[in-house]
Amino acid sequence: MHLMEFPREVILGKNLVPEVNNVIKRLKLESPGLVVYGPVTKKIAGESVKKAIRDEFDVYSITVKKAHIGEVEKVEAKIRDYNIKWAIAVGGGSIIDVTKLASYRSGIPFISFPTTASHDGIASANASIRGIEAKTSIKARPPIAVIADIEVIKTAPRRYLAAGVGDVISNITAVRDWKLAHKLKGEYFSEYAAALSLMSAKMVIRDAEIIRLGNDEGVRKVIKALISSGVAMSIAGSSRPASGAEHLFSHALDLLLDKPALHGEQTGIGTIIMAYLHGINWRKIKETLKTVGAPTSAYELGIDPEIIIEALTIAHKIRPERYTILGKEGLTREAAEKAAKITGVI
């Protein structure tokens, strides 16, 4: 059986806080609800979302600090203790991922209200949580609705929008890896999911100059691409259309660094290297990332070149069952260093 789950509503526009209650009503969600936010996103939109909901529904709130299993369990306890019927995540990737997994494990729906456009988790079924073995993608359920307020997202530092491009552009190498696994290992492959995923990547490449400006149109384009990417994963029933060797590289960096860079920044650099290994146009990918202001080197990422090399050599061990261009044995130190140097990453 192949189950596909999608958000029932995706709303993209301006000043959408007042629209939250209408979404709750249309989805026939009952009180009480739970607003999940971070210390920063509480001030950006969390408090105003809670205030708006409180006008018509019983609602509680909780602050989440990081994407860690301990925070997931904290949210689960709140859901259990207060008999919460649904949750709304107001924040970036970490807040959304924690809410996503806690809601899934508690058997309740959740709404995604992103405050940044930094990665495709805003609409996908997958969550990246630390503290569960290695930090990799954990299967949950997609949000029942996505409410993307351009005015809110536009207030985030430009770095986050550029990271969103880095996450979407990684679909290029992810789909290549997926095709490789299909050809060599007989893995299930969905042409439709792959096409939608690649369309998202092509869109940000085509519109890089607009996205660079960080205006309403640029933000809208990145959000649409991220949501399409999330939907592609739902169609595939896995993260395959948007997560290949470049994501394994990013997860390896997460393990090696005390303070990793943004997820999309790391996957963007990973995509440059993996595109080189695949023999495809890595220069165009690098040019796009430069255009939108995303880092394209270890120096710009603030990471020691030695860490980049080490991450490349251990990336294949992160998810051994996921076949990619790295193969079963991974890259030798020499091969990793060569790829990173040729592409200008180090």
Curated annotation (Swiss-Prot):
Q: What is its EC number?
A: 1.1.1.261
**Entry keyword annotation includes Zinc:** yes
Q: Where does NAD(+) bind?
A: 93-97, 115-118, 124
Per the record, its GO cellular-component terms are: cytoplasm
Q: In which pathway does it act?
A: Membrane lipid metabolism; glycerophospholipid metabolism
Q: Where does substrate bind?
A: 120, 167, 251
Q: Cellular location of this protein?
A: Cytoplasm
The record, for SUPFAM superfamilies, names: Dehydroquinate synthase-like
Reactions accelerated catalytically = sn-glycerol 1-phosphate + NAD(+) = dihydroxyacetone phosphate + NADH + H(+); sn-glycerol 1-phosphate + NADP(+) = dihydroxyacetone phosphate + NADPH + H(+)
Molecular-function GO terms, alphabetical = glycerol-1-phosphate dehydrogenase (NAD+) activity; glycerol-1-phosphate dehydrogenase (NADP+) activity; metal ion binding
Cofactor(s) needed, names only, are: Zn(2+)
Which NCBIfam families does the annotation name?
PRK00843.1
What does this chain do? Catalyzes the NAD(P)H-dependent reduction of dihydroxyacetonephosphate (DHAP or glycerone phosphate) to glycerol 1-phosphate (G1P). The G1P thus generated is used as the glycerophosphate backbone of phospholipids in the cellular membranes of Archaea.
The protein's name: Glycerol-1-phosphate dehydrogenase [NAD(P)+]
Which species does the entry assign this protein to?
A: Pyrococcus abyssi (strain GE5 / Orsay)
The organism's taxonomy opens as:
Archaea, Methanobacteriati, Methanobacteriota, Thermococci, Thermococcales
Q: Gene behind this chain?
A: egsA
